[in-house]
Curated annotation (Swiss-Prot):
Lineage of source species: Eukaryota, Fungi, Dikarya, Basidiomycota, Ustilaginomycotina
PROSITE patterns: BRO1
Organism: Mycosarcoma maydis
Compositionally biased intervals (Basic and acidic residues): 775-794
Role: Involved in concentration and sorting of cargo proteins of the multivesicular body (MVB) for incorporation into intralumenal vesicles.
Protein name as annotated: Vacuolar protein-sorting protein BRO1
Amino acid sequence: MADAHQSPLLLLPLKTTEEVDLGSAVKSLITNSYGEDSKKYSEQTSQLNRARQDAVKGAASDATGRDLLFKWFHMLEMLELRFPELRVPFPWKDAFTQKTISQSSLAYEKASIIFNIAATLSSLASSQPRMPGNADGLKRAYAALRQAAGMLSYINENFLHAPSTDMSKDVVKCLVGITLAQASEVFLEKTIEEKKGAGLISKLASQTAAAYTGLVDDSRENVTKGIFERSWAYLIQVKARHFTSVMQYYKALADDAAGSHGACLVRLTVAETAAKEARNLLTTFSASATASVTADRPSLPSDAASALVAIVNAQVARCTERKESAVKDNDLIYHDILPSESSLPAVDKLVAANPIPIQEIFAAPEVQRVIGPDLFQNLVPLGVHEKASLYSEEKAKIARAESERHDLATGEMQASLDYLGLPSSLQKYRALAQGSGSNAMLDSLADPGPEVMRWSTEEAEGGGGRGADGLGVGATGVDSALQRIESIKSQAANDIDAALAALDDENRECEKQRVRFGHKWSQDPAGLHTKDMRVNLKENKEAMQQASQNDAQIGGLWKSIRQDVQLLVSGREALEAAFAAALTGQTGLYGEGSAPTSLIDTSAEEESASEGEIASVRAKLAQIDEALIKLNKIKKERGEVLADLKEKIQTDDISQVLVLNRRAQNVDSSIFAAELEKFKPHQNRIAVSLHHQQALLAEVETAFKELIELPASKAAGAKWDEKEQARNKLVARLKRARDSNAQVRAGVAKGLQFYADLQEIVKATRQNVNRYVGERKSERSKLVSELEWEEKGSDGLSSSMAGLSGLGGAGGHPAPPTPHRHTSYASAYGGAGAPGPLSPGPPPAALPGVRQTSNSGPPPPPPLPHQQASYQQQPPPAAAAPAHDPYSSMFSSGPFSAALQQPASPQHQRPPTHYGSQLGYACDAPQRAPALPPPPQQFQPSFAPSVASPTQSRYTSPPPVPQGQQTFSGSSGYGMPPAPLQHGGGYGGSQPYAAHDYSSPPPQSPYGVPIGQQQYGGGHAQNQPQYQAYGAPPQQHASQQVYGSRAQPPPPQQQQYQQPSYAQHGGYQGGYQPPY
């Protein structure tokens, strides 16, 4: 019970004896009783004496001593069987009183050896290590104590008049109780070490406490009589109180777990009290244990006193600590009422230790290996064994012969009755024999029968699975499920089509802007990012198409059985009506219009049958029924006789007879014949049954042939066969409906799950597509605004410079600087190139020394997507002196003029949603763009990327995104998509393209030119683009050379948007075995 100590166990004392010469007595018996030369058994008799000496003198109380005692007991058993008249004095000292008692009986020697075996087993159990973590020691101690109890119980049951005190009935009974109590204690230790439930532990502790408590009075009495040592009684008292405390403690834990906090507190109080009582008894035990430990034959382990003190003190501390905690919890939290101790229910007992019978002990393989062969097996002559084997073969021949006769007769009877169709074929004639008319017999065919009604009950409860599929009962549930499947399938198809359409629109809008801005358009082609999304959408669509084929198969199967399934769930009345309709040959499943009183319309000739014909049918039926009853009775009796014969043959043993007659010559045959006569009555009864069976079968065959030849029987039989065939067809149809319905329900249930999973996947994919499109649209809107601003600023600067040259440099405003761009496209992919969204900034100030002719500044840049106002809503302020404003020409022509003349698109009025990067990801319709012009003849980009161009700067590592803008932190773009329904990440995410691996092949642009590998011509005159076929490499002209002033930046690794297809989710794979 404690971590550092194990509970001490009592050791039973050993009986001692003196040397006995068994060899001489056995030799004398061999010579006198068996008529053999005893010198041939000198070695065996020497081994016999040596075995006794080893068992009772030389061995210690360990496993070796136990095995030697087992071996010697087995020899005693064999001696008693062969030499029951053996008489040798066996002196033994009483284990407790040390008084010597001698008896000339093998039974006394056997009882003494059994007692010593029990004592040795108790010593083995006490010496086993039972510390925590040593499960094998616990098992060995538990088994040894149960075996000791079994040995002692055998003494009480078989040796009624014990000559010594140690083997008296009361003392042995007390010793059995002690060993079983200790076995229960060891099992409790194992249960506590394995951390079983508190309720189970309390039951085992209750049994252990009860066992020790019941031994208190007996141990005191034996101490008073001077049989037991005083330490035994004190140890039993201490353990009785200790395990009572353990029982109450674990029951308190169980009550606390069950919410009975008041009962828990009371039980903890009782447990603490019992533990303290055990502690108070330790003083007397410690004083008496010293004598038991230091004796010549100690009955307690050397550390018994210290170990028990530690265990009891630990229990006291455990109870006190838990009680204080329980009091505090109840006072502060539970406020539960404390019941009285007497009102607490008693703890149930669980018996965990029973004695192991001695027969089971010696039957164990390990014991059989120890005891070895019989020393005197040669005393039974081999010829006797051979004769016994011959006799056994004769018995086996009789058993085989009678079994064959029985099986042959039973098979012959069954074959004859099957050939005649009996007794089922008599049913068609019984109604006629009862005088109800030739058609009344057919009414029984309208009964659906137990099998069909069982099918009906199953279907009414929701099929063979009793509604476990959740589809409901009958056809309504399946119809509703099929409708749900179609609805979900339609929604999923719409989602897939919508997602593909959104990707197509996004790609089209991107390419429009690419055509519009040419080499300045730096947004990646959509194909770089949408390949995996398109593949996933395609795979899901193909999976849905495959599932639709299975849906069609299930629908067809369901259509063919729906009406029959509905009939099965309609109840008995509908089934009877259907069977009646089938018998009358009516169309319609439920037999509408059928006459309720008659199943078949027959002519007057068929209805009329003379009373004499009916009487003849009745007589033949009675004759056949009586013969069939007799046949069944004969079959049953014959089987019983055969079983009794086999049992007698199995238990018959004439070994003793053969041994007694082993000296007689040529008497084997007569002995065998006389012994085999005991089986003759059984053989005769089987033969008579065979004869009676043959006669009855002939009688049945004759009577049945006469029955079917009667005129009335012929007419009734013909009608019956016709209608029975119709009934069987209906039954087969209902069986098919029942079996197919199980397949349909299973397929529909799996189909619902499949489409539900598919819908979730498609929904997640569509959400990701929408997010991607919104991000791309937001990025495209920013790029368009910036490029338009560059164009307008460039055009305005040219006009202003022209105006300034007309003024002669005397005054006027300087050319406006190029609007500062706050992002190098790293921000468009998740970087933080600027602290906020792209802003045009304040208008530039007038250059020094230039005359100000107007109060108006340069025009503001175009609005960003998240700004509501257009240029018409925020026009530039009116100029004070427009004739002298050098910037006025910027708004009279060029792209700014066109931008101001166009009203803002209504699609741009909704403010976009902002995600993790600096972009405003608008999820509305694509931005208005000019129509895609017809493809030119050649497309060869020739611009040289500058330091500030997006091509040069977008793939560098951007600065980190400000903390306030990281709403999708940790996202990784489209390379690693989130799981369905777990949204996150933006177009660029917080991990920009700078960390990409560029070892993969360069991606292709939608027009066939690899991104990052365009070839540039030598002049601006050759900058007209030329369309190539999709996937075709661009044409290389001799006059063109690869741009070499600055190496092209490596292309970004294509990030894959890996939305798993439904097939990767373990979903539908096609096939119809079973559906879905």
